[in-house]
Amino acid sequence: MILTIKPLKGKECNVQVTEDEKVSMVKELVSERLNIPANQQRLLYKGKALADEYRLSDYSIGPEAKLNLVVRPAGERSGMASSSSAVSGVWQTLSTVLAKHFSPADAAKVHEQLIKDYERSLRQLSLDDIERLAGRLLHPDSEGMDTSYMD
């Protein structure tokens, strides 16, 4: 199938892939065509960011789909390091709590399932969801904002 990749700025390109192709491979093909390093690319489909380790079929991406491409600045990844260490600290704390209440084998299973559920929930957030959440967190006293999604 042929996918159209549309950068926010610049010309779009087409890539030939299969439904079973991983997102990381699509990024490599885009890198060859547009000279944008794969680690600086963020591909979006219907407003949702695509994770490298998933296949196109996992997102129900079919023939002639159009993916949006956001190019990250070269040094942006370093800013996420402190955020990821905070997240790993949360998972470490969770492991400690689970160890107090479950056997080691059960604690590991619960921990693994919680991580999967968390990551699945994040993948399902659209850009609109993230924008509303950010607005609510940045302006908690705003009366006119739609807060129905927070229930």
Curated annotation (Swiss-Prot):
Function of this protein? Component of the BAT3 complex, a multiprotein complex involved in the post-translational delivery of tail-anchored (TA) membrane proteins to the endoplasmic reticulum membrane. TA membrane proteins, also named type II transmembrane proteins, contain a single C-terminal transmembrane region.
- Mind telling me what this protein is named? Ubiquitin-like protein 4A-B
Keyword RNA-binding listed = no
Q: List the disulfide bonds.
A: none
In its UniProt entry, the species of origin is given as Oncorhynchus mykiss
Keyword Cytoplasm included in the entry's annotation: yes
- What is the primary gene name for this protein? ubl4ab
Which molecular-function annotation in GO is an example for this chain?
Answer: protein-folding chaperone binding
Q: Gene3D superfamilies of this UniProt entry? A: Phosphatidylinositol 3-kinase Catalytic Subunit, Chain A, domain 1
Entries under PANTHER family matching the protein: UBIQUITIN-LIKE PROTEIN 4A
Its quaternary organisation is: Component of the BAT3 complex.
Q: What is the lineage of its organism?
A: Eukaryota, Metazoa, Chordata, Craniata, Vertebrata
**Keyword set, alphabetical order:** Cytoplasm, Transport
Q: What's any GO biological process attached to this entry?
A: post-translational protein targeting to endoplasmic reticulum membrane
Q: Which InterPro entries match?
A: Ubiquitin-like_dom, Ubiquitin-like_domsf, Ubiquitin_CS, Ubiquitin_dom, Ubl4_C_TUGS, UBL4A-like, Ubl_UBL4A-like
